[in-house]
């Protein structure tokens, strides 16, 4: 296999892939220097997905936008909620009865700040996440909010039985030293000069909302540092 050499390498492969690359690189011969904090302080942003069935009528989720917007549930503090439709799903070759049913459902989500007590490890060449929903009380609040939404609207709300996230964060966190973090304030990996992380793996805490802006701000900060002379 060929080799490429560079003074600086920026990892922005997404939280899961960045962790996988770091674990694999640290275990290969002549690879990365050890990272004691790798895999610690991992989170899922308390994402919980569900669906809300609306009453029959002219309205269809196929003619909605992917994101309709955020909303609050009275009496529930902490989580953020939002909903959206399924535009374009009706163009797929699905049975007519299934399309009629899906047209009545809205995509529903709740999310918030989880504790970061979860972790990730690399076992048998596979990245494994250790996440216990029971350690995150916010999930109970989100499920309770879904129940309130159903009782107040009179329309069924269904939540997935297990958390399902697209907002993983951490595992290669910003920290003050190698024992408490994987990257320093510049985004450079401790013990591995010239290696930088600019994605959600470096976040030291949950954002509690879609984290794209926070990740973009972090990447911009690291890029600014790389652009400086010296």
Sequence positions of predicted segments:
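Short, well-ordered loop/turn elements at secondary-structure boundaries
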Residues: 4-7, 12, 103-104, 151-152, ...
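FAD cofactor-binding and catalytic pocket of flavoenzymes
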Residues: 6, 35-142, 190, 197-204
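A residue-level signal for conserved active-site and pocket-lining positions in enzyme catalytic cores
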Residues: 42, 110, 146, 174, ...
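A glycine-rich dinucleotide-binding beta-alpha-beta segment and adjacent secondary-structure elements
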Residues: 134-206, 212
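Glycine-rich loop(s) and the adjacent beta-strand/alpha-helix scaffold that form part
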Residues: 1-62, 199, 218, 224-229
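A conserved FAD-binding loop/helix module that cradles the flavin
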Residues: 204-226
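Flexible loop/turn segments at secondary-structure boundaries
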Residues: 17-19, 59, 116-119, 165-168, ...
């Amino acid at each position: 296999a060929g080799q490429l050499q560079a003074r600086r390498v920026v990892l922005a492969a997404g939280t899961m892939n960045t962790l996988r690359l770091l674990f694999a690189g640290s275990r290969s011969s002549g690879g990365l220097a050890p990272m004691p904090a790798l895999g610690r302080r991992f989170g899922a942003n308390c994402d919980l997905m569900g669906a809300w069935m609306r009453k029959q009528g002219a309205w269809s989720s196929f003619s909605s936008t992917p994101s309709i917007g955020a909303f609050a549930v009275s009496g529930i503090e902490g989580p953020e909620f939002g909903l959206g439709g399924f535009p374009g799903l009706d163009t797929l070759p699905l049975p007519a009865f299934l399309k009629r049913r899906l047209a009545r459902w809205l995509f529903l989500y709740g999310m918030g700040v989880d504790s970061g007590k979860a972790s990730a490890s690399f076992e048998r060449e596979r990245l494994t996440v250790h996440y216990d929903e029971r350690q995150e009380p916010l999930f109970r609040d989100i499920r309770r909010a879904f129940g309130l939404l159903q009782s107040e609207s009179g329309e069924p709300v269904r939540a997935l039985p297990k958390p399902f996230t697209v907002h993983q964060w951490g595992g290669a966190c910003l920290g003050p030293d190698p024992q408490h973090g994987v990257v320093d304030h510049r985004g450079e990996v401790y013990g591995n000069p010239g290696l930088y992380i600019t994605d959600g793996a470096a976040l030291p805490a949950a954002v509690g909302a879609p984290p794209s802006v926070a990740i973009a701000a972090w990447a911009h900060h690291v890029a600014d540092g790389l652009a400086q002379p010296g």
